[in-house]
Regions:
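Enriched for short, Lys/Arg-rich terminal
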Residues: 61, 68-99
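Generic beta-structure capping elements
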Residues: 6-8, 46, 85-90
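A short, surface-exposed loop/turn module that caps and links secondary-structure elements
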Residues: 41-67
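Short, hydrophobic secondary-structure boundary micro-motifs
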Residues: 29, 51-55, 96
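Alpha-helical transmembrane segments and membrane-interface helix-loop junctions
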Residues: 3-5, 17, 37-39, 43-49, ...
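Residue-level recognition of specific faces of alpha-helices
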Residues: 12, 35, 39-42, 65, ...
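A short linear boundary/processing microfeature
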Residues: 19-22, 49, 90
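Arg/Lys-rich, positively charged N-terminal/basic patches that mediate binding to nucleic acids
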Residues: 1-35
Length: 99
């Protein structure tokens, strides 16, 4: 298995890092992003660990989400590739979730 990060997921990580750099500290921002990436790596051992995402079911890809603090790591599995589609802040409206 391998991980693949979609462009929207990579953009979201940059947004998260930028926000926390300004509103917390650069060190906290890096620690948060590193933690999210580390949690995503755990999917390589247990790709079905996350819960199904009903909001994205209409896409037919079997999206799942894994909780990481106040964030959800949104992904789907396609063969041997785990596609990370979003790092979603749960304080946002669910319709902003990227799949």
């Amino acid at each position: 298995m391998k991980l693949s990060y979609t462009l929207p997921a990579r953009q979201r990580l940059v947004e998260i890092e930028d926000y926390f750099t300004v509103h917390a500290s650069p060190k906290a921002a890096v620690r948060l992003v590193d933690g999210l990436l580390s949690k995503a790596l755990g999917l390589l051992k247990h790709p079905k660990k996350g819960k199904p995402v009903k909001l994205l079911a209409h896409r037919g890809l079997g999206h799942r989400s894994l909780s990481a603090g106040r964030f959800l790591i949104v992904y789907y599995v396609d063969g041997e590739i785990i596609h990370i589609t979003d790092f979603f802040d749960t304080r946002q409206h669910p319709t902003r979730m990227r799949g």
